[in-house]
Amino acid sequence: MFRWSWCRLIISKVSAESYVDYLQNSDRELPALSEIFPRHGTGTGELVKFHSLLCEAMKDHNFNYVGIKVVPPTSPPLQCLRATEPVCVPIFSNSFQGSVFSAKQHRIQFVEPLFVIRLGRDPPTQLTANTVPAVCDAFFPGVEFVGSRYPFYPPHTTGFAADLGGCVAVHLGEAVSLGSASLESLGDTNFVVTRREEPIQVGAGKNCLGGPGAAVALAVSYAASMGWPLREKHYIFCSGVGSRSPALAGEYKVNYGAYGSVSASLT
């Protein structure tokens, strides 16, 4: 039994390393994602273990673990997969690549707005939505470029989560201190997404699990279950706050009005 468990751990580490090669767009031949990712239907424990080993592998490759992305079941990708529960995935420093991207080179399929919170201190491993504001210090408007390491789209929620929710790149605007704005009022604030100065969608932070408080609490809990707890200066990336827009060339801007904006371009 011990030998079987040890062999399985080694295989899991190899799988995480192989996925790092996918994230780095390696030229060498890689195993199919179905051979790397946890099997669908095996339960959340295998996915949590994969994410934990991936955090370790990314650290070995000098990519910092920067936070957790929360994807609600109301988001377009999870609705397509008929998911009933939210998905959490770790995000790493390789996602922060500047503000100009190539849809073809980076295999970007969609552009999505983000509602991003930064922790101002180490949180306890269990939070409630009411106690979340005490550990948060800043809000950032964000934009995410989304694709898939699958040939087209993930076939199920396990694949979606193992593939980090399709995250290719993230770009953030300037920080807004939560001393000057409450978390819930920010969550109620509508934003507008434009492409080439033409509005293409609207949304609000509350579209992620009803408000940022619930999203932060879930992210903190999931990070603790991975064995990689969130710390001061880590981020919570609230996804599903708007719709997905097809990745077309042009400058995209997510505008929160008085709470700032962020711009990034696709070529």
Curated annotation (Swiss-Prot):
GO terms for cellular component: cytoplasm; mitochondrial mRNA editing complex; mitochondrion. One of its GO terms (molecular function) is 2-oxopent-4-enoate hydratase activity. GO terms for biological process: mitochondrial RNA processing; mRNA processing. Disruption phenotype: RNAi-mediated knockdown at the procyclic stage does not cause defects in RHE2 interaction with H2F1 or their association with components of the RECC and GRBC editing complexes; however, causes a slight decrease in the association of the GRBC complex with the RECC complex. No defect in mitochondrial mRNA editing. Keywords: Mitochondrion, mRNA processing, Transit peptide. It is found in: Mitochondrion. Its main location: mitochondrion. It comes from the Eukaryota. Component of the REH2-associated complex (REH2C) composed of helicase REH2, associated factors H2F1 and H2F2, and mRNAs at various editing stages; the formation of the complex is RNA-independent. Interacts with various editing complexes including the RNA editing core (RECC) complex, the gRNA-binding (GRBC) complex (also known as the MRB1 complex) and the RNA editing mediator (REMC) complex. May play a role in mitochondrial mRNA editing by facilitating the association of the gRNA-binding (GRBC) complex with the RNA editing core (RECC) complex. However, appears to be dispensable for mRNA editing per se. This is REH2-associated factor 2. It comes from Trypanosoma brucei brucei (strain 927/4 GUTat10.1). The lineage of its organism: Eukaryota, Discoba, Euglenozoa, Kinetoplastea, Metakinetoplastina. The gene is H2F2.
